[in-house]
């Protein structure tokens, strides 16, 4: 995930944007940090999904085919 100081800076810029507004440089920094955050979030979510197996009440593996293929590609 994103470093704590970067998350703090995102929040700081968001507060400033609501109150006083951002300079062009700050707006650019905010956009860059948000892109980094979204990229880190997506990677974490993808990594988590690659560990998921779906089991129905009968005990059968019903993991979607697309996910199984993605897991296979990732781990082999």
UniProtKB/Swiss-Prot annotation:
Keywords, in A-Z order: Cytoplasm
Compositional bias per record (Basic and acidic residues), positions renumbered to this chain: 63-76
Gene3D superfamilies from the UniProt entry: Helix hairpin bin (1.10.287.540)
SUPFAM superfamilies noted in UniProt: YnzC-like (SSF158221)
Annotated spans, Disordered: 57-76
Subcellular location: Cytoplasm
One Pfam family, short name: DUF896
One Gene Ontology cellular component annotation held by this UniProt entry: cytoplasm
Superkingdom as given in the UniProt entry: Bacteria
Keyword hit for Isomerase: no
UniProt xrefs under InterPro entries: DUF896
HAMAP family for the chain: UPF0291 (MF_01103)
Protein family according to the UniProt entry: Belongs to the UPF0291 family.
The protein's name in its UniProt record: UPF0291 protein GK1331
Species assigned in the record: Geobacillus kaustophilus (strain HTA426)
